[in-house]
Amino acid sequence: MVVCKYFLQNRCRYGTNCKNQHTVPSNGQNAFSKVNVFRPENGRPPIWVQRRLKRSDLDNLLPNRRMKDINDDLKNAKPQWPFTGYSVVENLPSIYEGDVSPEELRWWAYQAKATNNMQAYEQRQKQLMDDVEAKAAAVKRSPAAAFDEMRNKLVGKTNYKSIFDKSTSNSTVTSNQFNKPTQNSPFNSFSNNNNSFNNNQQANDIFGAPTTSAFTSQLNASPFSQNTSSNSFTGSNPVQNNPSSFGSSSFGSATSGPSAFGGISQPNSSFVNSGQGIPNSSFSSFSQVASGFSQSQNVNDPSSIFGPTVASGFGIQNQPQQSAFQNLNTQFSLPNNSQPVFGHTSLTQPVNPNGFTVQPPATFMQQPQGPFVPPNTTFESPFANVTSKISASGFSNDNPANKNIIQTPMFGSSNTIDGPINPIGASSIQTLDDQVEMSNSNQNLAFPPEMIQQFEAQDFIPGKVPTTAPPPQFC
């Protein structure tokens, strides 16, 4: 059979199931190439070591020349995590053990913090550190005895004196967690204790202090309801007066403590034990407006939209209420003397609290009037090219004395206009006399020669198109 080369390199992935042969070289030079192995597990020797390795082969696997490297390994090549075992050759048992993972220490810290026993955790951590340092010091003092310790473990010898007996005599609780009797179960914190789910029992935690189980049912006040000693639907036996966090007990029990929601809880009776039947409302016990966590309502509260009051299923007694669809003063059935929703009407005027009568706002083209507006005040029209002196009438100027008055317009030049003023601006209708007067005005104008040439041209030239009315000789 072919020898497995990966086994000689100590990286065969198949182990005992490999189809090639796993043999240990007689010289021991290539079988184990890695020295000073710090490993986090305390595993047993491999199966091939227990079956095939002889005492004569140990001298080849563990030559004396490697003993001098132990001091260097423990001094210079020591890993950062202190709670780690040490072996001079890979795949062989550790010379000394003391492996504790960071997860284990973290779990112990959580346990200590939960039971308020951090002092025991710190003491246990110090003991573990002292134990590992004592074992390392024993190996450095006698490396030859450390190799004999490994040989005895490999051959399965048990009746030998360990070199770590003196170093570990001052640390008698190495296998114990926190001064607790050592147990064989991997879950030793639960082996000799009571069931965690028993009622009214106390369980001993891993720190030795009796604590209450997280799942134990104690006779304490529940944060959500009251502890009752009878069926909540019968109402025959009295209940305890432990206040509930929500202010009301379950299904009709009387409460006397304050509610966590601010409502005033008073002794009420529900439909379960009050002698009343189940209400006939089609909305059952949830048809009332009042919530089980709110205060008692009175007649002045808003009316229910579902009609008459029914008994609450949560012990809240409601006062008689009226339906919103009956003869109520709602927004849909306002009386005749009520005020409109969007302000006062046009028939009435609001009263000024200062004692003055408020005039309604001016309409379109109507001038403001009031106690602060003097009479015969001139206002400018924002739409016309001319302005006029407007009297009380906003549509005409009937006073003959106001004619032929030139006033300053708002948007441009103005002309003197006799007669009534157009209320929507200057007159856009021109009479025949106005057109004749406009045509006669062009006869008196002196056109420049270049403009005369534009009118005399046979074709339109861009930039030289006349933009005014032609003179009379071209008409």
From Swiss-Prot:
Zinc finger region(s), C3H1-type: 1-25
Record's compositionally biased regions (Low complexity): 183-204, 243-252
Entry keyword annotation includes Phosphoprotein: no
UniProt subcellular location: Nucleus
InterPro entries registered for this protein in UniProt: Nucleoporin_NUP42, Znf_CCCH
Location, primary (coarse class): nucleus
GO biological process, one term: cell division
One GO MF term: zinc ion binding
Compositionally biased spans, kind Polar residues: 165-182, 220-242
Region (Disordered): 165-208, 220-252
Domain of life of the native organism: Eukaryota
GO cellular component: cytoplasm; nuclear periphery; nuclear pore; nucleus
Function: Involved in the cell polarity process where it is required for the correct termination of microtubule growth at the cell ends during interphase.
Protein name per UniProt: Nucleoporin-like protein amo1
Classification of source organism: Eukaryota, Fungi, Dikarya, Ascomycota, Taphrinomycotina
Name of the coding gene: amo1
